[in-house]
Every structure is written in structure tokens, then in C-alpha cells.
From Swiss-Prot:
Name assigned to this protein: 4-hydroxy-tetrahydrodipicolinate synthase
Keyword check for Lyase: yes
Organism listed in the record: Campylobacter jejuni subsp. jejuni serotype O:2 (strain ATCC 700819 / NCTC 11168)
Annotated pathway: Amino-acid biosynthesis; L-lysine biosynthesis via DAP pathway; (S)-tetrahydrodipicolinate from L-aspartate: step 3/4
Gene field: dapA
Function: Catalyzes the condensation of (S)-aspartate-beta-semialdehyde [(S)-ASA] and pyruvate to 4-hydroxy-tetrahydrodipicolinate (HTPA).
Reactions mediated catalytically: L-aspartate 4-semialdehyde + pyruvate = (2S,4S)-4-hydroxy-2,3,4,5-tetrahydrodipicolinate + H2O + H(+)
Site (Part of a proton relay during catalysis): T47, Y111
Length: 298
């Protein structure tokens, strides 16, 4: 299998709700907007997609909508398929594969704090259950466990279809260390604030929250960097600084969904508890940044 399979500019899709249910029409419309604005892949039902509060049926529906909407285009679907129970993660991975996803993104098991050996066996079981690309997802600030550099490299070398890692630890040194020890690995940025540093240090793509709102800018930033035009990439990165900052003023995806609502891109600003709407102060800050960027609706 070609391990360079799903790279470039990717969007961690939000999941719009309406009257307490997944707004399927809005979801498909958001994906079409990504397709039209230069995104290489969409990532349904990840952290930004509120996967933790979706039912398994809703999770599967979102994957099906993404696959159907991207059918016939060059845009790939990297479906979220993570769980803190290995058998559930395997089941989600198999569903994604059987329903046409091009690959899966699998977050490290959360809450139960497995050892590195447990993490290795967890991911090996997932990789062996499907024959599509698997991207590891390291986000210790949410999961409570870190996939070590050694474990990531061992999984990459032992499992043919594990092609890289989405790094959202905020640790640039770790990212550089990973590529120094295994330069064939596909390192993907999982934090908009460090997209440019990762891309300019050998990263091969981003999974962006900001690109829900500004897919064209994230696409341009990513492709300039991949073409080694770092001057233009940094210019765009600098332009995105303020909005990247405000889109993480509260827990993701609260700010990005608020921004999408203010821009008229989703009909209803709904979350599922324990997530809730932003504070009045942060709502006002998001509005102000939207005005500065002259985003649709302002």
C-alpha cells in the first residue's frame, strides 16, 4: 500500500444540529463547500464533529453522507473511527471501509489510560481489521494519554496501512524528533496554531478546524508550504493568526460552530451537553473577528 495516500489540506468537519438531530442537509452542503474551495480531504466525526456525543447510528450516517457527497470528486474521506474500547474502534473502522471511506483517523483511547503496549495492541488490531489507510491521532490534552514517539514509529513500521500521525500535542520538538527517526512517516498537523511550523519542518498536511470557515485560505497555506513556497505560506499563516486564536477561545468546537452560525453557514447554533454555547464575552469576540475578516454575513 502507498503510505502517502491522504495528505494535504483536510477539514475536521463540524456536525450541525437542528432540533436536536443531525442536520443532514446542512452537513452535505458544508462538505460541498469544502470540495469547491480546494480541500483535499474531509474528516467527519472527529473531535470537531462532536463524535463523543453522537450515537453510533448518527456516527455512521455522517460517514455515509460524507462519502456520498465526495463521490466523483478528488476529495477523500478520512473518517473518524476512534474509541476507548478496541472492539468498538474496530467496528467503526470496518463500517467506514465497507461504506467507501478512503481511510480512517483513530484517536488514542481516552479515560482508561492504557500503557504503551496497550496502545500498540489497540492500533495494531484496528490496522489489521481493514485494508485502508489508518492515521493515528495523538491529542493527550483530551485523551489523558500520549502515544510515545517510539510507539508511533513501531506502529508505522509494523503495520503496512498505518501511514502517519495527526499530532495535536502542541509539541514541535516531538514532531521534529518523529521525522528525524522515521522520515517516511506522514506527519499531519492537528492544531491550526502550529500548522505552519509543522509544515515547514517536514509535515505533509493539516487537519484544520479553521478550514470549516476559511477552506480556501487553509488550502492555499498548505499547498504553498508543500510546494516549499514558505514565504507565501507564512504570509497566509500570519493573516490567519487572529482568527485561529479566537476559534480556540473556548473548547473546540464551540467557537467554530458559533462562527459558522454567524456566517450563515449553518441554520441553528446547537450543541449537545455537556457542550454549550459560548459566553456572551466570547460570542462578542467571535463576532468582532468575523467583522475584521469580512466573512460572509458581516
Amino acid at each position: 500500500m502507498d503510505k502517502n495516500i491522504i495528505i494535504g489540506a483536510m477539514t475536521a468537519l463540524i456536525t450541525p444540529f437542528k432540533n436536536g438531530k443531525v442536520d443532514e442537509q446542512s452537513y452535505a452542503r458544508l462538505i460541498k463547500r469544502q470540495i469547491e474551495n480546494g480541500i483535499d480531504a474531509v474528516v467527519p466525526v472527529g473531535t470537531t464533529g462532536e463524535s463523543a456525543t453522537l450515537t453510533h447510528e448518527e456516527h455512521r450516517t455522517c460517514i455515509e453522507i460524507a462519502v456520498e457527497t465526495c463521490k466523483g470528486t478528488k476529495v477523500k474521506v478520512l473518517a473518524g473511527a476512534g474509541s476507548n474500547a478496541t472492539h468498538e474502534a474496530v467496528g467503526l473502522a470496518k463500517f467506514a471501509k465497507e461504506h467507501g471511506a478512503d481511510g480512517i483517523l483513530s484517536v488514542a483511547p481516552y479515560y482508561n489510560k492504557p500503557t504503551q503496549q496497550g496502545l500498540y495492541e489497540h492500533y495494531k488490531a484496528i490496522a489489521q481489521s481493514v485494508d485502508i489507510p489508518v492515521l493515528l491521532y495523538n491529542v493527550p490534552g483530551r485523551t489523558g494519554c500520549e502515544i510515545s514517539t517510539d510507539t508511533i514509529i513501531k506502529l508505522f513500521r509494523d503495520c503496512e496501512n498505518i501511514y502517519g500521525v495527526k499530532e495535536a500535542s502542541g509539541n514541535i520538538d516531538k514532531c521534529v524528533d518523529l521525522l528525524a527517526h522515521e522520515p517516511r512517516m506522514m506527519l499531519i498537523s492537528g492544531e491550526d496554531a502550529i500548522n505552519y511550523p509543522i509544515l515547514s519542518n517536514g509535515g505533509k498536511g493539516v487537519i484544520s478546524v479553521t478550514s470549516n470557515l476559511l477552506p480556501d485560505m487553509i488550502s492555499a497555506l498548505t499547498h504553498f508550504a508543500l510546494d516549499e513556497n514558505y514565504k507565501e505560506a507564512k504570509k497566509i499563516n500570519d493573516e490567519l493568526y487572529n482568527i485561529n486564536k479566537i476559534l480556540f477561545c473556548e473548547s473546540n468546537p464551540i467557537p467554530i460552530k458559533t462562527a459558522m452560525y454567524l456566517a450563515g453557514l449553518i441554520e441553528s447554533l446547537e450543541f449537545r451537553l455537556p457542550l454549550c454555547s459560548p459566553s456572551k464575552e466570547n460570542f462578542a469576540k467571535i463576532e468582532e473577528v468575523m467583522k475584521k475578516y469580512k466573512i460572509k454575513g458581516f
